[in-house]
């Protein structure tokens, strides 16, 4: 028996809008790459990004399919996000590289050259 995906609107999508919330409650929506494994979504970003700061303060997020530029392609779904320990990042990097290929490798290389510290978000259905 196959279990239905908890994120059906994100099936076969390349980008999703991730909406996080400032301490004031104001939403901030950002288009991001993601990988889905079972009932979880994984996102790569930089440790000093606004997304990470906002998730650290409030793990309630919303996700929806979108274009590369963030134009919504479907309904928004509530979810819960948390920051993964850095040692779990290799697995997430592999998932994202499998999905996005050379472009993901280039982005990771440039980030490493800049001395950026990566951060990885795990997102589950709310």
Question: Residue locations for each model-derived region?
Answer:
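Short, structured beta-strand-loop surface elements
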Residues: 48-120, 124
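A general marker of short, structured functional hotspots
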Residues: 3, 17, 30, 38-40, ...
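Generic, ordered loop/turn and secondary-structure boundary motif
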Residues: 8-11, 29, 53
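Short helix-to-loop capping/linker segments positioned immediately adjacent to catalytic or ligand/cofactor-binding
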Residues: 5, 20-24, 106-111
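Short flexible/disordered coil segments
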Residues: 2-5, 29-35, 81-86, 126
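Short beta-strand segments
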Residues: 13-47, 62-65, 74-78
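Short, basic/aromatic recognition patches
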Residues: 1-16
């Amino acid at each position: 028996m196959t279990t239905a995906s908890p994120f059906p609107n994100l099936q076969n999508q390349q980008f999703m809008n991730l909406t996080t919330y400032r301490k004031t409650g104001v939403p901030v929506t950002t288009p991001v790459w993601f990988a889905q494994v079972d009932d979880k979504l994984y996102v790569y970003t930089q440790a000093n990004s606004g997304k990470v700061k906002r998730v650290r303060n409030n793990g309630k997020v919303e996700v929806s399919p979108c274009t590369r530029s963030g134009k919504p392609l479907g309904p928004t779904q509530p979810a819960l996000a948390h920051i993964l320990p850095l040692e779990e990042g290799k697995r997430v990097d592999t998932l994202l590289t499998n999905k996005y290929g050379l472009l993901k490798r280039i982005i990771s290389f440039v980030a490493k050259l800049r001395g950026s510290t990566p951060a990885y978000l795990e997102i589950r259905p709310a």
